[in-house]
Amino acid sequence: MSTPSPQLLVAAAQQTLGMGKRRGPPRAVCLHLAGEVLAVARGLKPALLYDCSSAGAPEIQSYLEKLRGLGFPTQGLHVLEIAENSLIVHPEYVRRHLEQVLLGSIAFVDVSGSQPYPAVCSLDQLQDFKALVVEIITHLQGLQRDRSLAVSCSRLCSSAWNLCTVFGILLGYPVPYTFHENQGEDNCLAQTPLRVFTARISWLCCQPPVLLYSFSVPESLFLSLRDILNTWEKDLRTRCRTQNDFADLSISSEIVTLPAVAL
């Protein structure tokens, strides 16, 4: 793909994602957002959670159409609304990812506030959530039957969903956090050493790399989760080799301890 000029990418975002008299996101945010969209289109990540402004699904659709006019491969991308949040997803890639989740490709970490420390759990221990994954897959399969729109939009009802876990799997995290909602949103991660993983990849010349992933796992569970994390890294590196828009994938980790962790 021939990369549009940074000026055109910034203009596309600022013309469509501004609300009222406010302009769209700042220049650096506009360029990073375009890189994330391209990463979703190329299958390097299944989805991105839009949090650059208060723009809703119609504005995000307009933005993606604007990018398409600049030569971006946005046809087939979809704006998925969940509980007042908008995600830009590639339905086919997300569906494949969720099907792998059902096969046990990822682990979950229970961080319920009632526990003294985090614990690994499997999808089989989260039967309600397993049914939810099936529901999302069914929804995405319906979307793939309608290719009439370049960029489509839909909404998923989510009144009783654990959004922390839902977003974790949709964004492609290999080890999402989960917790028992009937015990509130408190968690047991405060003052717990966390290993934070960050994956970045270069795109535009003379611009900072695009942040593909950022997630954490409790350091106490790192050894038991290492195989899943290694598989995730290997898969990401394989996908990066199948495209030509990005280069120089970098995956790093650091250990942090925080007084409180918001999920």
Swiss-Prot record:
Highest rank taxon of the organism: Eukaryota
Pfam families referenced in this protein's UniProt entry, alphabetically: DUF4504
InterPro entries found in the cross-reference section: DUF4504
PANTHER family: UPF0739 PROTEIN C1ORF74
Protein family (similarity comment): Belongs to the UPF0739 family.
Record's protein name: UPF0739 protein C1orf74 homolog
